[in-house]
Amino acid sequence: NTCQPTQIAAIALDGRNLKLKGTFNSEIRAEVDDEKAIAAGLGPIEEGALKVTGKTREQIAKAPQLKTVWKKFTAFVDKYNWKGTPFFAPIPAGFNIIGYDMKIINRLCKEFGPWDAKRGEQQLFSKVYKIDVMDNVWMWTEGDPSIKSISMDSLRERMGMSSENAHDALQDVKDTANIMIKFMKTHRAVYRNLKIDKVFANGELYV
């Protein structure tokens, strides 16, 4: 993924009670000259993206450098690595995080660290688990023919969330977190009454 991030935002949630534990947010300087960006192997900043975020090239050019912001961001994430090892690192969660954000994170970890050279992957977040809220929502709604879209904008409208600042990175993170928490609380409530022990012991399988 060659996308140039112009903002990094994240919140940390307690894995047990799902309460807010910390917040990170910073603008990032990106290469605003399209020719220079392409020459560096990066995607140029699209005018459509600027319209969505409300940012200008001038503002982006004055933001803190990516390397500086990344160092602060990784320090923020590491605060919540309770054993200080890659396998106990925070679980990354987001909307389409597997198909989009994690690709950028892998790229930036390879460039600035932390990077696992042996495995060829990032070493900032959990190596085992990832929570993609988009996939989660799809699992809940796939059997409902009335659902035409599960985009963030559609979910905001359906769930009665404000669309103000909807494409600011921090607001996106908060909105995604609220949706995730709602579904996780539902998961937990359903699981308490779910009977799965020896459910296939009678040999009645689906396939």
Question: PLM features: residue spans?
Answer:
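Active-site metal-coordination segments of metallo-dependent hydrolases
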Residues: 141-145, 164-171
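A structural motif
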Residues: 144-158
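Substrate-recognition/cap helix-loop segment adjacent to the acidic, metal-dependent catalytic center
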Residues: 100-129
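Short, surface-exposed acidic
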Residues: 57-61, 116-127, 163-169
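Conserved non-catalytic scaffold segment of RNase H-like nuclease domains
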Residues: 1-106, 154-161, 167
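Short alpha-helix plus adjacent loop in nuclease-associated cores
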Residues: 127-146
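Acidic two-metal-ion nuclease catalytic site recognized across multiple nuclease folds
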Residues: 158, 170, 174-207
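Alpha-helix termini
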Residues: 78-87, 113-119, 191
